[in-house]
Amino acid sequence: SGSLLGMCLIVRIITGLFLAAHYTADTSLAFNSVAHTCRNVQFGWLIRNLHANGASLFFICIYLHIGRGLYYGSYLNKETWNIGVILLLALMATAFVGYVLPWGQMSFWGATVITNLFSAIPYIGQTLVEWAWGGFSVDNPTLTRFFALHFLLPFVIAGLTLVHLTFLHETGSNNPLGIPSDCDKIPFHPYYSTKDVLGFALLLTPLIALALFSPNLLGDPENFTPANPLATPPHIKPEWYFLFAYAILRSIPNKLGGVLALAASVLVLFLIPLLHNSKLRSMTFRPLSQILFWALVANLLVLTWVGS
């Protein structure tokens, strides 16, 4: 699944570059520039749909990748694991700032709600939020800096990915039995290269199907309305890949408590290597751990469902 994440990143950087060429980061022009891209730019509609739906595929892959790492004890490669968690955080940040750029209703209010969470931090919270906004509300300065961040972060992710791989190559990767596999090593080409290309094909097929047949299936219809600071949408909610975290945030009736729970739900991944307490590395022969693992997966699915 790592190679799929790499391909997601490459596809999104390429489509993103083409989109950035036609995008204008200004509150009065952003919404119209996206509409212009879809209507007047050659294949602009396709580039935008691939870019927008590629995020969903990226998150599916990264969640599968994390689940696989948890199941097989890959987190015992501590450096690789920790950089992986940082990569997840960077991806979540990138997706968030990117969602704001079309400057529709959900873009604007999503940005307002999530940036506002920083005000829950004691003492420095309010200052921090106004500093992040560049004013007293989400406005033009916020949009321009979010565009800058959305352009920068994917390249940071690409750089971190190289570090992630470098650390992985120190030890070599793990396998389902959790035992050394030196005797089973085979040439990368044609074996792994073929396996990766098959993965690419299997990933690109649903992406292209989604982009061509139902590009707006996963989006929020609210975002077809240009941002209006005076009208709050009836239901503010994030894209599906953040729903589990949003459900945790909203289930706690205290601002700071919700923020801490939200942060903890992702940052807990940093603790996993410290919590490993078994003589066996992977869960292949540990039925109790398997039950807990699949309970965790079920929990995340239920949270995603409840959050919507």
From Swiss-Prot:
GO terms for biological process: mitochondrial electron transport, ubiquinol to cytochrome c. A ubiquinone binds at H169. SUPFAM superfamilies: a domain/subunit of cytochrome bc1 complex (Ubiquinol-cytochrome c reductase), Transmembrane di-heme cytochromes. PROSITE patterns: CYTB_CTER, CYTB_NTER. It is found in: Mitochondrion inner membrane. It is a multi-pass membrane protein. Heme 1 (or BL or b562) is low-potential and absorbs at about 562 nm, and heme 2 (or BH or b566) is high-potential and absorbs at about 566 nm. Belongs to the cytochrome b family. This is Cytochrome b. It comes from Garritornis isidorei. The gene is MT-CYB.
